[in-house]
């Protein structure tokens, strides 16, 4: 199964899904031994001059037959408009799947079908099965840690992966969580205590757990995280909230990175993976994941250490142009230092797009000087002393 999509930048800096395709390749053991490719859906949409959407669905003959089913085309158009306005996928919407299922139910009411209608029904059933498989794959194997989850450590929380979602654990105090989070927290601590000492020497986690009742009178667990550091022959126990932001950030990502390292089907996306993490430590972790990880890791970062540990083909740079936001640096050789090339490109602007706005050190110095004079010119109001009675 192959799922493809085209992304179209908008004037307000967002991204529209302008085309989605789903193809099915037959097994090489079938037919003449060559994997025959079958297009189940090629859906393209664009915005016309008056703001109305123009769309096509291919193969045209089969989808034309499916659209002829009662209310099907109207439901497709409604979902196209909604998904376009919300900048999301049309194919993976619940409404699209519901419409396909309803179409199959309507067609199946007829005992005798024309050849084209029968072919359309068979394709529709294949598409329903494929979408279920892809949706299940995404729920089980794809995880996205946004800036919101990552930044939670700055506010005394650690993100924890729970099923296909993220929860946050308050680490600033003992907290009562639902009973079904017990295994998730225990797994997080266990994984951390295997990996943490290899990247942060002499550091482990400890979790105090006690039976409790939640605010809604359901079974819960009272949880308080601590860190344990070995200092000579002694162990020093401190609340986990007192650890550095980088350590808390790593603990929050460990379950995801562990899955990426071990599972070939895992696809993990992390926004600003470098936030608060010591750059040498970040580089060592990324190098191991790149060389030995079995899954796929997609991330954004500001730290240039990444350019020294990852192959250039795995890196895409952002630009200042909202209409052409990403590019690869040209002229990179095996012996090139990508970090030096990037810094030079920013300074002399030798790439097709500007990688970052150029900043004049002299103008920055002048601005600081002016800002300082503003403070000097600010005069505190004087308070008039009361007159004493003569």
Question: Where do the protein language model's features map onto the residues?
Answer:
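Short alpha-helix of the ABC ATPase nucleotide-binding domain corresponding to the H-loop/switch region
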Residues: 278-283
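Conserved ABC ATPase signature
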Residues: 215, 219-258, 265-267, 273-277
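Post-Walker A helix-loop "phosphate-sensing" segment adjacent to the P-loop in P-loop NTPases
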Residues: 259-263, 290-293
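Long, charged, glycine-rich C-terminal linkers/tails
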Residues: 202-222
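Conserved nucleotide-sensing/catalytic segment adjacent to the nucleotide-binding pocket
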Residues: 1, 235, 338-340
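Short polybasic amphipathic segments
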Residues: 17-24, 221-231, 315-316
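C-terminal lobe/lid and adjacent interdomain/linker elements of RecA-like ASCE P-loop ATPase modules
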Residues: 284-390
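Electropositive, glycine-dotted interaction segments
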Residues: 3-198
């Amino acid at each position: 199964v192959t799922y493809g999509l085209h992304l179209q930048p908008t004037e307000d800096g967002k991204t529209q899904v302008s085309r989605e395709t789903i193809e099915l390749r037959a097994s090489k053991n079938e037919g003449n031994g060559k994997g025959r490719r079958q297009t189940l859906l090629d859906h393209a949409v664009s915005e016309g001059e008056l703001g109305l959407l123009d769309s096509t669905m291919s193969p045209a003959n089969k989808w034309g037959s499916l659209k002829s089913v009662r209310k099907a085309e109207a439901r497709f158009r409604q979902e196209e408009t909604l998904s376009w306005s919300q900048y999301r996928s049309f194919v993976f919407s619940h409404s699209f799947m519901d419409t396909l299922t309803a179409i199959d139910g309507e067609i199946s009411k007829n005992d005798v079908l024309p050849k084209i209608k029968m072919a359309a029904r068979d394709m529709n059933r294949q598409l329903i099965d494929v979408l279920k498989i892809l949706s299940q794959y995404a729920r089980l194997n794809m995880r996205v840690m946004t800036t919101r989850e990552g930044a939670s450590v700055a506010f005394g929380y650690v993100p924890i992966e729970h099923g296909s979602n993220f929860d946050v654990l308050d680490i600033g105090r003992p907290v009562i969580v639902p009973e079904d989070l017990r295994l998730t927290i225990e797994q997080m601590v266990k994984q951390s205590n295997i990996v943490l000492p290899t990247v942060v020497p002499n550091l482990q986690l400890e979790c105090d757990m006690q039976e409790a009742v939640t605010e809604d009178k359901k079974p819960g667990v009272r949880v308080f995280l601590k860190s344990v550091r070995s200092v000579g022959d002694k162990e020093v126990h401190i609340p986990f909230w007192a650890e550095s932001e980088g350590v808390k950030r790593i603990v929050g990502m460990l379950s995801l990175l562990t899955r990426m390292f071990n599972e070939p089907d895992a696809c993990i996306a992390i926004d600003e993976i470098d936030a608060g993490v010591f750059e040498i430590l970040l580089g060592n972790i990324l190098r191991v994941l790149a060389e030995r990880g079995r899954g796929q890791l997609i991330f954004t970062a500001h730290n240039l250490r990444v350019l020294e540990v990852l192959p250039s083909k795995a890196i895409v740079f952002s630009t200042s142009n909202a209409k052409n936001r990403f590019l690869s640096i040209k002229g990179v050789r095996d012996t090139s230092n990508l970090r030096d090339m990037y810094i030079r490109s920013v300074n002399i602007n030798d790439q097709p797009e500007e990688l970052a706005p150029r900043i004049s050190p002299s103008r920055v110095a002048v601005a600081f000087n002016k800002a300082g004079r503003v403070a000097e010119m600010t005069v505190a109001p004087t308070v008039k002393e009361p007159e004493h009675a003569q």
